Amino acid sequence: LKTSAIIGPNGAGKSSFVRALEAVKGIVFASEDIQNPLRKYLAKSAFAYGDGKTRPCEISMDILLDKGEAGNEDKPSIIARYTIKATQERFYEESLYYIINGSKKVMFERKWEDGEYVYRFGKFYRGEKKRQVAKLPEDRSFLQGAALKGGQTALEVYSWLDAKQDVLTLGYGANAEKVILDSLKAHPEWSDQIVSFLWALDVTDIFRIQVIRNDKGLETVGISHCFVNAKGTEAYGQTFMNESLSLRRLILIAVSFFEAFSKEKIIVIDDFGQLLHPYVLTHIVEIFHANDMESQLIVVDCNPALLQKDLMRKDSIWFAEKGEESSTEFVSLSDFRGIKAKQSIYDGYLQGIFGALPIESDFCFQNKVKENN
């Protein structure tokens, strides 16, 4: 799938998907100076409590490592399934399986049983075992430890997470500007590409974006605008943080797309359509589709504009809503049967056919101060 979307009302828990991806990457890549990676990346996360705050949560992800070649047994498809089950104090389970041409093979399993870890390694596992097991703390990932020791199997998944999974920041503040600064310094030729990207979205008054230094001597993103008046065409410049929130977000999306257009990446964007016009939103998706690099865009949003006809495949759209116990339930659009080819998914969603709509009720502000007087 080139693109995929999770759509639902505010407060439905859509973003828990993104937070889980961030948590896994944070735990696996935690530096040595972080005393307890589990507490740092699972604390205050709604998905992390399982059936209670003291019981482990479980996160599992499938990673396509190799598409393989159909009919060629020497080049099978390989899907890595990495799973963690942990509280903020320790791992209770950690496992890596490879699904090779549909056949599930264990690489490693780590389980907490009777106060100690029990390990199991498959015959296809390549890497250090006994010494790595003996030294591993309860709050550290075996995948990380094995990869840093050069373990071939662990390194395949570790390298994929490092190089290909990218969760985009919201796109407004200093973190977003740093991403853009780093991209422009590494790829100065992208400056003109960003301008062209903005022009494609009808932002036509910008003619230059570059790295400059502000009054304090610090690097910042400088944006040059032009305008027409009675004297002719004139120009003025602004820094990134003085631009509108929507323009900052578009520039960040542009550089993240360029990364994905240059090498295979998985871009995950939360609140994708925030501050963006629906037409701009859909055209951004079309721009991503038009590129031939085998990268993937996964977005989370409230905006039903993503349901416009022929924008995304049915099996790439998921709806999110709160269940009876306030847990988030995800349902694929492809699970709904009887949808006619000519039927508008967009209209059907707004009519409530697929659920995942906000349930509204009346609200009346109670001015208690006035009532008491």
Residue positions per predicted region:
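Extended helical coiled-coil dimerization/tether regions that scaffold
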Residues: 174-242, 362-372
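Conserved lysine of the Walker
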Residues: 14
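The conserved Walker
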Residues: 10
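C-terminal lobe/lid and adjacent interdomain/linker elements of RecA-like ASCE P-loop ATPase modules
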Residues: 263, 283-373
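Short alpha-helix of the ABC ATPase nucleotide-binding domain corresponding to the H-loop/switch region
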Residues: 277-282
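Electropositive, glycine-dotted interaction segments
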Residues: 72-210
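Conserved ABC ATPase signature
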Residues: 4-7, 213-258, 262, 266, ...
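Conserved P-loop NTP-binding catalytic core
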Residues: 1-5, 19-88
